[in-house]
């Protein structure tokens, strides 16, 4: 993907997610429950009941699980053998993300920079350090260089750190591919 003379252009929606999220969610207004801590999901004859951490249970015709497979198994009260087999195959990896303004994690020459900049340490068991050039990705016209680094293995100037976050990302391995094919 990276060449010095012909770099691919990252496509973004004008106005960002503030533009398209309201358009996508408007038809769902009043029909979708979000930001509710679900403790259990149980199936009935004609409905699915959600037990919440901080509100009374609610029943629905259908439920969409927007979470990792292990999370489905921890809240689904009565998973079938097939569901257990499928959802246990979706594994995740934990990643530390650091939002910062330390441009030293990008290549020194601006023309050598890409949207995603990888730093490998040679150990196949260690995830790469990836620094996203947010100015390039988000077309930011600011004098400050904004970066998001995953799994930093080199020191980031602490005065430049705007936030640290821990994420779990799905592993796209053979188990996941086979599980998707079964569902």
List each language-model region with its residue ranges.
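Active-site/ligand-binding neighborhood in enzyme catalytic cores
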Residues: 1-42
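Short glycine/proline-rich, acidic loop/turn segments that cap or connect secondary-structure elements
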Residues: 174-183
